[in-house]
Swiss-Prot record:
This is Interferon regulatory factor 7. Residues 69-88, 133-156, 242-277 are annotated as: Disordered. In the absence of viral infection, maintained as a monomer in an autoinhibited state and phosphorylation disrupts this autoinhibition leading to the liberation of the DNA-binding and dimerization activities and its nuclear localization where it can activate type I IFN and ISG genes. Residues 11-126 bind DNA. It comes from Homo sapiens. The gene is IRF7.
Length: 503
């Protein structure tokens, strides 16, 4: 009689497991904060600190053990202590990814930067309709459905998960294997995928505030960036196309309704936490863009675009826009600019922006479509004023979809940067110059109208890598000029000695 095949052990669900571990009282710093057990804290010490101990990683290790990921199967005893130390960063990353993906918890406070007691405070979410299942637990990615080539290649799904979302960064995996393996590990750790980006924005639209509500531009105050005015005919030499009419307005780029980012009100605790608990932290959508608009170096607008698509316009936004429509970003009026020549040219440029510049996130790429007569040049580089070289400036063709940023390229460069295989930090700041060629030799900050876009996901990943000690600074080229602490007293003493000498 043939034996029935042994059934695999049921997969451990993170939410139920974590609640049990909190109630066990076996972990220092992991505890409930209220009698109703709706609010708890998790110790969260940065692993680069010198006072890190085994207890600081105990809860992260416990999750790896519960998943069967530790200890590794080997003969001749357990792994050495140094092997466990090398795995701690990965344990913490997997724990963080599981904590976010389960949707059973919402972060109330982030005190991980507290030098005396680093921790985070979470509460149970009221969204009980989100039930845990094997698909929602994405702490460790399964075999990828299609791995992108290390250099370029057609877009395709990165991971095989379907119930996933972009996550905030954790430490990238230690370099092991070839460059392709490193890129795959980085993508797995960051939970970035084509359909993940779409799912984080495009599923089940929820009502939100009308675009622009509660988000106002910065007032035009302070001194204007200096510099002589432009020659009278300079503007029309490159800025405005000579086509007689803007032509028919293209159809919307999106093929389906896109969702607005999840409303913070949907992440309230299931039960009221203790009075000491503060409100939930409003973390931007993983694909959010930090938008800065500058008029000749002067910042006139800063806002976060959390929608999968947006349109840059000049003039008041349409009050009838729906939550599922592209988010509208309005250029502020240059009326308060003190330089009248700059004001006149800026106004002329902005009038030709209509019917707008459209941005849309498609999978791992950000696409742009210029619909107005005002020419727009784009490039990707470092922050303003940095010495990091930028990509060659390119003109956005009119009424044509153009990819201007690829997350896959960024993560490949980030892995090389972390492995010390790349001198400069990866570039992720996107510049859009309206009416002036960014490659003309002038500083970008001197452009009449400059839009700076920073993907939130890229910034936090790079900052996390830099906090691990990776830097683009070359110590061999640094020459620090410091005064001697005693130089002043030495000069005074020499002066007094000269006074005592006979003439």
């Amino acid at each position: 009689m043939a034996l029935a095949p042994e059934r695999a052990a049921p997969r451990v669900l993170f939410g139920e497991w974590l609640l049990g571990e909190i109630s066990s009282g076996c972990y220092e710093g992991l505890q409930w904060l209220d009698e109703a057990r709706t609010c708890f804290r998790v110790p969260w010490k940065h692993f680069a600190r010198k006072d890190l101990s085994e207890a600081d990683a105990r809860i992260f290790k416990a999750w790896a053990v519960a998943r069967g990921r530790w200890p590794p199967s080997s003969r001749g005893g357990g792994p050495p202590p140094e092997a466990e130390t090398a795995e701690r960063a990965g344990w913490k990353t997997n724990f963080r990814c599981a904590l976010r993906s389960t949707r059973r918890f919402v972060m109330l406070r982030d005190n991980s930067g507290d030098p005396a007691d680093p921790h985070k405070v979470y509460a149970l979410s009221r969204e009980l309709c989100w039930r845990e299942g094997p698909g929602t637990d994405q702490t460790e990615a399964e075999a990828p459905a299609a791995v992108p080539p290390p250099q370029g290649g057609p877009p395709g799904p990165f991971l095989a998960h379907t119930h996933a979302g972009l996550q905030a960064p954790g430490p990238l995996p230690a370099p092991a294997g070839d460059k392709g393996d490193l890129l795959l590990q980085a993508v797995q750790q960051s939970c970035l995928a084509d359909h993940l980006l779409t799912a984080s924005w495009g599923a089940d639209p929820v009502p939100t505030k009308a675009p622009g509500e509660g988000q106002e531009g910065l007032p035009l105050t302070g001194a204007c960036a200096g510099g002589p005015g432009l020659p009278a005919g300079e503007l029309y030499g490159w800025a405005v196309e000579t086509t007689p009419s803007p032509g028919p307005q293209p159809a919307a780029l999106t093929t389906g309704e896109a969702a607005a980012p999840e409303s913070p009100h949907q992440a309230e605790p299931y039960l009221s936490p203790s009075p000491s608990a503060c409100t939930a932290v409003q973390e931007p959508s993983p694909g959010a863009l930090d938008v800065t608009i500058m008029y000749k170096g002067r910042t006139v607008l800063q806002k976060v675009v959390g929608h999968p698509s947006c349109t840059f316009l000049y003039g008041p936004p349409d009050p009838a826009v729906r939550a599922t429509d592209p988010q509208q970003v309005a250029f502020p009026s240059p009326a308060e600019l003190p330089d009248q020549k700059q004001l006149r040219y800026t106004e002329e440029l902005l009038r030709h922006v209509a019917p707008g510049l459209h941005l849309e996130l498609r999978g791992p790429q950000l696409w742009a479509r210029r619909m107005g007569k005002c020419k727009v040049y784009w490039e990707v580089g470092g922050p303003p004023g940095s010495a990091s070289p930028s990509t060659p400036a390119c003109l956005l063709p009119r009424n044509c979809d153009t990819p201007i940023f690829d997350f896959r390229v960024f993560f490949q460069e980030l892995v090389e940067f972390r492995a010390r295989q790349r001198r400069g930090s990866p570039r992720y700041t996107i510049y859009l110059g309206f009416g002036q060629d960014l490659s003309a030799g002038r500083p970008k900050e001197k452009s009449l109208v400059l839009v700076k876009l920073e993907p939130w996901l890229c910034r936090v990943h790079l900052e996390g890598t830099q906090r691990e000690g990776v830097s683009s600074l070359d110590s061999s080229s640094l020459s620090l000029c410091l005064s001697s602490a005693n130089s002043l007293y030495d000069d005074i003493e020499c002066f007094l000695m000269e006074l005592e000498q006979p003439a």
